[in-house]
Amino acid sequence: MGSVSNQQFAGGCAKAAEEAPEEAPEDAARAADEPQLLHGAGICKWFNVRMGFGFLSMTARAGVALDPPVDVFVHQSKLHMEGFRSLKEGEAVEFTFKKSAKGLESIRVTGPGGVFCIGSERRPKGKSMQKRRSKGDRCYNCGGLDHHAKECKLPPQPKKCHFCQSISHMVASCPLKAQQGPSAQGKPTYFREEEEEIHSPTLLPEAQN
């Protein structure tokens, strides 16, 4: 009977092995596609604060020194820090990264020991701020260039044309603005008068003689 029991046991094991589910091809492909996280350390090679990305110079991988260093792409969204996220050139970092079709890409970037990154002192200059500065700030109450209307010390002034300073009409219906060419539009009358006086031949000594 012992031999019969052994045969039954062997047969049961074989049957169990046959019934064991095999790994689906989809699961195997998914496991192969999942990025393998690697650990590295190094410094920030460069970082563009306006674009929000740069490259790390990896000097060690999994505790093993690399010579020469290897570049690893970094995006601001991967930085472990508060507030505006950026990196300072030469800043020491630790990070996890993966291999992609484009190269090495960082997954999470911290300072040494997992602390917050220091970040760059630079801040991007917004286009809206540059446009606002180029046009200049003007007080809509008195026309002054050194303050805003809310800071004006004069009482409320009557509304007037910002082009010729006349109170009889607004800038949209200004006859002088309509007569001027595109190059003169946007310049108040007193600016144009000063330019005309500067370029007038009556002020030149040769013309007076």
UniProtKB/Swiss-Prot annotation:
This is Protein lin-28 homolog A. One of its GO terms (biological process) is stem cell differentiation. Overexpressed in primary tumors (overall frequency approximately 15%), overexpression being linked to repression of let-7 family miRNAs and derepression of let-7 targets. Facilitates cellular transformation in vitro, and overexpression is associated with advanced disease across multiple tumor types. PANTHER family: PROTEIN LIN-28, PROTEIN LIN-28 HOMOLOG A. Expressed in embryonic stem cells, placenta and testis. Tends to be up-regulated in HER2-overexpressing breast tumors. It comes from Homo sapiens (Human). RNA-binding protein that inhibits processing of pre-let-7 miRNAs and regulates translation of mRNAs that control developmental timing, pluripotency and metabolism. Seems to recognize a common structural G-quartet (G4) feature in its miRNA and mRNA targets. 'Translational enhancer' that drives specific mRNAs to polysomes and increases the efficiency of protein synthesis. Its association with the translational machinery and target mRNAs results in an increased number of initiation events per molecule of mRNA and, indirectly, in mRNA stabilization. A zinc finger (CCHC-type) spans 137-154, 159-176. Gene3D superfamilies: Nucleic acid-binding proteins, Zinc finger, CCHC-type. Belongs to the lin-28 family. Residues 39-112 form the CSD domain. The modification N-acetylglycine is found at residue 2. SUPFAM superfamilies: Nucleic acid-binding proteins, Retrovirus zinc finger-like domains. Residues 113-136 are annotated as: Flexible linker. Keywords: Acetylation, Cytoplasm, Endoplasmic reticulum, Metal-binding, Nucleus, Phosphoprotein, Repeat, RNA-binding, RNA-mediated gene silencing, Zinc, Zinc-finger. GO terms for molecular function: G-quadruplex RNA binding; miRNA binding; mRNA binding; pre-miRNA binding; protein-RNA adaptor activity; RNA binding; sequence-specific mRNA binding; translation initiation factor binding. It holds the Pfam family Lin-28A-like_zf-CCHC_2. It is found in: Cytoplasm; Rough endoplasmic reticulum; Cytoplasm, P-body; Cytoplasm, Stress granule. The modification Phosphoserine is found at residues 3, 120, 200.
